[in-house]
Amino acid sequence: MAASCMLRSSFISPGLPQLHHQSTSKPNNGIHFFTPIKATATNDAISQQKHRRPADENIREEARRHCSSHNFSARYVPFNAGPNSDEWYSLDEIVYRSRSGGLLDVQHDMDALKKFDGQYWRSLFDSRVGKTTWPYGSGVWSKKEWVLPEIDSDDIVSAFEGNSNLFWAERFGKQFLGMTDLWVKHCGISHTGSFKDLGMTVLVSQVNRLRKMHKPVVGVGCASTGDTSAALSAYCASAGIPSIVFLPANKISMAQLVQPIANGAFVLSIDTDFDGCMQLIREVTAELPIYLANSLNSLRLEGQKTAAIEILQQFDWEVPEWVIVPGGNLGNIYAFYKGFQMCKELGLVDRIPRLVCAQAANANPLYLHYKSGWKDFKPVKANTTFASAIQIGDPVSIDRAVFALQQCNGIVEEATEEELMDAMAQADSTGMFICPHTGVALTALFKLRNSGVIAPTDRTVVVSTAHGLKFTQSKIDYHSKEIKDMECRFANPPVEVKADFGSVMDVLKSYLLSQNSKL
């Protein structure tokens, strides 16, 4: 039986319904949950006084004070193993591949989770939204039972990541796509500015646990196209764990490069591409006690899957028709599938959305594989793309991505450099400020709308994976029309004008007339 901390205060929410046990059998005596009470104005005030943390007690001490136990568990198993496979590993083992050399997956004890019905889990997750109780203020750790159920809350390394904005892209959807129900899940609104935080909080928390268990881990390393290294270095710095980063020289933005440097990572700028860096970090972690943080390590996907759960939660547990995800190393498309599928299997929803994986045409091995009918996957040499984080020609999670897309009748699309930059500029013109990777996803949406695959009324979610502020140079180049062989149709360069009233008025009148003609 594993110990875990369930904070009493996180289960109390005004008007929250009672949580009922679904199973008719006797509950396991090792499971102890606090049942939410329906709060009134009076008992809510009493509750706030009762659960206020004493002045001399820190947030982790409060978590320990309200500690209880459960019998949920998880383990590593070979990815997509058959029912007769008996191979498995504890999450406390340092292992990245199965005996046959294949990928691993984190398998949860679904029988234990199914002892509680969908209404229970919906109410539990909803009751934690907006709380500061440790660690449930995090959008990842608010689903702790589904992520790393056996880790002690004292070992968790979190910046309360997740809980990212899901907003209605009304003007963009109506003006450019004729859509009325288009949404953007902005995972870039996070601690280090990308969705990688969701996975890194899980991985670094487990490393923190392993180091306390005196496992041979002297640091954590990754190959990166920018965002992974930013997340790794930040979370390792928070826990006082050394981080080692392999970056392809001159292939990431300065904003991405400065993040691991600022957070104290040991950064190696290597004269190769991401695939070359990935090969080197694999070889290094096989020889040195450095924990591998790339998505070959399936722990990260446990955190990333919570974005899918969060989308359902933000829609009041209604399922959208489509979710479009940019894809490079391809772990995220599988993570989204896994999150949606867990919600279906545990009764929170009755179906899952169709997934679309969007790739840059300059790095499109999954797209080519999809167009061939999933026959004979071949890596490609990734060419330079403005969507630098997905400039990957030999994705680690290809098998995971294919499985996910086949299970949900998914689609793969691609975007040329001009298409993705135009889409980014169009989105920005309606009040967004997106990254080029989101431009790839929006291009996929344009194509699927134009072909009639996605209907104008289909509820569709585009996953924005990073913050646009990481990619300002690409936006400057576009609006300055300085990109070779690109028309930059939606560029909006500044207008140079003399410093006198008449010149300014002439320019303004011309601008206002042009705007009026568009009405």
From Swiss-Prot:
Function: Catalyzes the gamma-elimination of phosphate from L-phosphohomoserine and the beta-addition of water to produce L-threonine.
PROSITE patterns listed in its UniProt record: DEHYDRATASE_SER_THR
Pathway(s) of this molecule: Amino-acid biosynthesis; L-threonine biosynthesis; L-threonine from L-aspartate: step 5/5
Cofactor: pyridoxal 5'-phosphate
Protein name in the entry: Threonine synthase, chloroplastic
Chief place where the protein resides: plastid
Family named by the database record: Belongs to the threonine synthase family.
GO biological process: cysteine biosynthetic process; threonine biosynthetic process
